[in-house]
Amino acid sequence: TINQTPSAPTAGASPNPICSGNALTLTASGQSGATFTWTSTVTSGLITGSTAVGAGNINDVLTNSGTTTGTVTYSITAAGGTLGCPGPTVNYIFTVDPIPNVSNATLTQTICTGNNASFIPTSNVLNTTFTWTATGSSANVTGYTAAGAGTIGDVLTNSGTAVETVTYVITPTGPAPNNCVGTPVNFVVTVNPAPTVNAVASQTLCNGSATAAINFVSATAGANFSWTNDTPSIGLGASGADSVPSFTAINNTNAPITATITISPTANACAGP
C-alpha cells in the first residue's frame, strides 16, 4: 500500500500586517485526515512572541519592540492519513508594524499671554502622523484650536489674573496601510497673565513739601514693579523699584513743574501694560 502525499496546506489568518501587541491566529487546513506541524522564524526586525515549534492552529501575540516593520515566517507542513506521510511545507510571512510614539523630550511650554504656543511632534516611527485635541483650564484662556493635526501653533490669551493652562492631547498614528495607533501624550502650555497695577492718584504739592509714598498693588500674585521719573529735578531719582518713597518736592523755577512717573509691572517674566 502506498499512501498518498497530502496536498499543500492552506491557512486562514487574522489580518496581515498586524500592529505590535495584537494576536495572530492562523488555522491550517487541507485534505481530510491531514495533520499540521509548524515552525516559526523571525526573519526581520525585533519581534518577540512567536512560538518556535507547534502543531495545529497558531495563536501568537507578536510584539515589535523596534522602530521599523518586522516579519515572522511560519512554515506549515501537512501529514496525511494514518501513516502520516509528510507533505509539502508552505511558508506564511506575517508583517508586524511597530507602535509609534511621541518622542519629543519636552512636553511643556510656558508663555506670556498673547504669545505663540508652538509644538512640532516627532516619533520613533518614520511617517507617523499626529492628531490632537485641546482644552483650557478656564474660560479666561482663549485662542486654542479645539482639534487639529500635525504642528501646533496657537496664539493664546489669558484675560484673567491667575496662571492658566492649555492641555493638548496628542495621538500618534503609524503609516498606512495598518495605521497603528500609539499612546496619547499631553503637551501642556502654561499661559501667564499680563500683570496690572492699581491706579495711582496724582499729587499736587508746594515747593519744599513732603510727598506721600506710593505703594503699588497688582491683582496678579507675585508681581514686581519698576518705575521711571521723567523729571528728576523735582527731588526724586530717575528710576526705582517697588514703591516710590516719600521725598521733598523741589521747584526752583518760577512756573509749575509736572513730573510723570511711569510704572511697569512684571510677573512670571511677563510685562504688564
Predicted regions and their residues:
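Extracellular low-complexity Ser/Thr/Asn/Gly-rich intrinsically disordered segments
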Residues: 1-273
